[in-house]
């Protein structure tokens, strides 16, 4: 059985908790709660968490589905180097960001989600995972003539693959001396010149 990559789960959890923090902060600020400044803090912290967590990290095995527009944010996250690559730093950062938002009822759900994401990042860091960006693969140009193995022998329209089966010996003998209607021969020689 394969090994679980915890960073992938932490990334999804942290991104969702950032959105929950933003929503709770908007409710607290727009509702003019008595401690509305914690709501304003939650909006700022949620936006920061969403920007940090939007680019997915590359998986060790298999392919990673890139988020829409991720390549632009990946360049920004790469600029901070080990601060964004190391999951110990992310675990501590998310835990510290979640504490002030826990003092307000509207943002306590985002706080709990971000604390859970922090715990998952800590588990990923203990298991030796780190964030690596998804780099675009260089496109390989197909070489001209390298993809064509052998040109078709029958002129179009060609029959389907089932009908193109090799004839048995009896059918070949009948076709050789039989009535016309067999394969047509092109009277003009065709040459394939690849430049």
UniProtKB/Swiss-Prot annotation:
Family matches, as Pfam families: Cytochrom_B558a
Protein family (similarity comment): Belongs to the p22phox family.
Membrane topology type: Multi-pass membrane protein
Disorder noted: Granulomatous disease, chronic, autosomal recessive, 4: A form of chronic granulomatous disease, a primary immunodeficiency characterized by severe recurrent bacterial and fungal infections, along with manifestations of chronic granulomatous inflammation. It results from an impaired ability of phagocytes to mount a burst of reactive oxygen species in response to pathogens.
Segments on the Cytoplasmic side according to the record's topology features: 2-7, 54-69, 81-86, 127-195
Crosslinked positions (Glycyl lysine isopeptide (Lys-Gly) (interchain with G-Cter in ubiquitin)): 149
Modified residues (Phosphothreonine): 147
Single GO biological process annotation from the record: positive regulation of smooth muscle cell proliferation
Localization of this protein: Cell membrane
Functional description taken from the UniProt entry: Subunit of NADPH oxidase complexes that is required for the NADPH oxidase activity that generates, in various cell types, superoxide from molecular oxygen utilizing NADPH as an electron donor. Subunit of the phagocyte NADPH oxidase complex that mediates the transfer of electrons from cytosolic NADPH to O2 to produce the superoxide anion (O2(-)). In the activated complex, electrons are first transferred from NADPH to flavin adenine dinucleotide (FAD) and subsequently transferred via two heme molecules to molecular oxygen, producing superoxide through an outer-sphere reaction.
Non-traversing membrane segments, not crossing the membrane: 70-80
Effect of residue 157 to Q: Loss of interaction with NOXO1
Modifications made to the protein after synthesis: Phosphorylation at Thr-147 enhances NADPH oxidase activity by promoting NCF1/p47-phox binding.
Cellular component terms (Gene Ontology): apical plasma membrane; dendrite; endoplasmic reticulum membrane; endosome; focal adhesion; membrane; NADPH oxidase complex; neuronal cell body
Record InterPro entries: Cyt_b558_asu
Residues bearing the modification Phosphoserine: 168
Alphabetic keyword roster: Cell membrane, Chronic granulomatous disease, Disease variant, Electron transport, Heme, Iron, Isopeptide bond, Membrane, Metal-binding, NADP, Oxidoreductase, Phosphoprotein, Transmembrane, Transmembrane helix, Transport, Ubl conjugation
Segments traversing the membrane: 8-30, 36-53, 87-104, 106-126
Assembly notes: Component of the phagocyte NADPH oxidase core complex/cytochrome b558 complex, composed of CYBB (heavy chain (beta)) and CYBA (light chain (alpha)). Component of the phagocyte NADPH oxidase complex composed of an obligatory core heterodimer formed by the membrane proteins CYBA and CYBB and the cytosolic regulatory subunits NCF1/p47-phox, NCF2/p67-phox, NCF4/p40-phox and the small GTPase RAC1 or RAC2. Interacts with NCF1 (via SH3 domain). Interacts with SH3PXD2A. Interacts with DUOX1, DUOX2 and TPO. Interacts with NOX4; this interaction mediates superoxide generation.
GO molecular function: electron transfer activity; heme binding; metal ion binding; protein heterodimerization activity; SH3 domain binding; superoxide-generating NAD(P)H oxidase activity
Annotated stretches, region: Disordered: 134-195
Source organism of the structure: Homo sapiens
Ranges facing Extracellular side: 31-35, 105
Gene designation: CYBA
Protein name, as recorded: Cytochrome b-245 light chain
């Amino acid at each position: 059985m394969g090994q679980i990559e915890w960073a992938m789960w932490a990334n999804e959890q942290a991104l969702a908790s950032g959105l929950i923090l933003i929503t709770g902060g908007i409710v607290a600020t727009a509702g003019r709660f008595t401690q509305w400044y914690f709501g304003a803090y939650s909006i700022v912290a949620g936006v920061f968490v969403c920007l940090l967590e939007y680019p997915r990290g590359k998986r060790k095995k298999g392919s990673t589905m890139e988020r829409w527009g991720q390549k632009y944010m990946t360049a920004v996250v790469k600029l901070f180097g080990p601060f964004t690559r190391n999951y110990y730093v992310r675990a501590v950062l998310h835990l510290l960001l979640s504490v002030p938002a826990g003092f307000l009822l509207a943002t306590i759900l985002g706080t709990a989600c971000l604390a859970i994401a922090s715990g998952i990042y800590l588990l990923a860091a203990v298991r030796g995972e780190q964030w690596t960006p998804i780099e675009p693969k260089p496109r390989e140009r197909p070489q001209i003539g390298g993809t064509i193995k052998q040109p078709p022998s029958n002129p179009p329209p060609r029959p389907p693959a089932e009908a193109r089966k090799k004839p048995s010996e009896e059918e070949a003998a009948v076709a050789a001396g039989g009535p016309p209607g067999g394969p047509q021969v092109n009277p003009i020689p065709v040459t394939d010149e690849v430049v």
